[in-house]
A protein has these predicted regions:
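Short alpha-helical segments enriched in small residues
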Residues: 2-138
Length: 138
């Protein structure tokens, strides 16, 4: 997970009893970690950059495989205050959501505020989208 530094797993494990259904999360802050831990191809990282749709898709698929999970959420973004560009300004965050059944969606959002605000908004967005798109009607 990119710009949140594991906050999604933190919020999930704040719930009493979450150990019954949450096994693990991956904090893959560096490109090397993305490649080593969840199999993101170096070519994908080089061609598109870490904050991109192809990378978060590979992250989600890799997390599903590595964890043998039912659901995976991947996040990669630019929380700031530095690191933004005209094409990818600070606050840009890519998300991928994947299931073991082969379903998946991607989303790109641009959040405002300081680094902490971007990270909090990204975490909330990831959990809300996972719930609304995949878990609410199961």
């Amino acid at each position: 997970m990119g710009c949140t530094g594991g906050w999604v797993a933190k919020v999930i494990t704040d719930i009493a009893g979450s150990s019954a259904w949450f096994e693990r999360g991956f904090v893959t802050y560096s490109n090397e970690a993305k490649a080593q831990m969840i199999g993101v191809r170096e070519e994908t990282l080089a061609q598109h950059g870490a904050v991109s749709e192809p990378v978060v898709v590979e992250m989600a698929i890799g997390a599903l495989k590595a964890a043998r999970a039912d659901y995976a959420v991947s996040i990669s973004g630019i929380a700031g205050p530095d690191g933004g560009s005209e094409e990818k300004p600070v606050g840009t965050v890519w998300f991928a959501f994947a299931t073991a059944r082969g379903e998946g969606i991607t989303r790109r959002e641009c959040f405002s505020g300081d680094r902490d605000a971007v990270r909090r908004q990204a975490t909330a967005y990831a959990l809300q989208t996972l719930w609304q798109q995949f878990l609410q009607n199961t």
